[in-house]
């Protein structure tokens, strides 16, 4: 995972950003965290094996020249899903605040488009605000 942290003018990268894997005997959940794409995800998969459920960020990615290292775009999010061999992924980090230049609904529209293109319909989904699902 890659990002940066800052809460005031003088504390750049004094705290760490992260993702985490929660494991039980029969289930693994991966909270990817706030990140840009990197090859770290293939290493995570090698360490933990296939993931049962992942929360993967899909928003706040434009302009790419500025956001690429900190926020993955939808195609990169799909690559993370593939890299970690997630059985099911839920999109996060989109649609709450207008943080960047892409339209608020674009990440979900692109997720639906690229999920179909990659045969991931119902495997990588975006929930509407307040929506729940059974796992």
What are these regions (language model features)?
Residues 28, 35-127:
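Cap/insert and terminal regions of metallo-dependent hydrolase folds
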